[in-house]
């Protein structure tokens, strides 16, 4: 019996391993890169004739010498720097998305934070939660000091 290799790619007549070019007239095709509004033109460099798609700005310098079929040696420092830049870009975009989703907070010039409008109620029950009470005067501790000693001290 012939054993099949589990990791071996099998070609069938109906499916192709080659990537397909998106067709804007066909609704089920892959959307074009230009239609993706989350990425700017600076972040995407495409050259359809050579099959190059680059997201990292550090890779733009290698766009003339690199393509999908070519093997290019890259130093470890360049790889780490590229990973760092890409991760930083992802983190900043996620923070930007989260900051848009959160209710904007109002800050005054001296750094004090104003509560958001949803938590500000004019109800008298809420006053104790939002406003601190007046400071309490400490009670004087009464001491019984002998009047003769008091005259000497004061």
From Swiss-Prot:
This is Cyclin-dependent protein kinase inhibitor SMR11. The keyword Signal does not apply. Probable cyclin-dependent protein kinase (CDK) inhibitor that functions as a repressor of mitosis in the endoreduplication cell cycle. Residues 27-38 have a biased composition (Low complexity). The gene is SMR11. GO terms for molecular function: protein kinase inhibitor activity. Residues 1-44 are annotated as: Disordered. The lineage of its organism: Eukaryota, Viridiplantae, Streptophyta, Embryophyta, Tracheophyta. Interacts with CYCB2-4. Keywords: Cell cycle, Protein kinase inhibitor. InterPro entries: SMR11/SMR16.
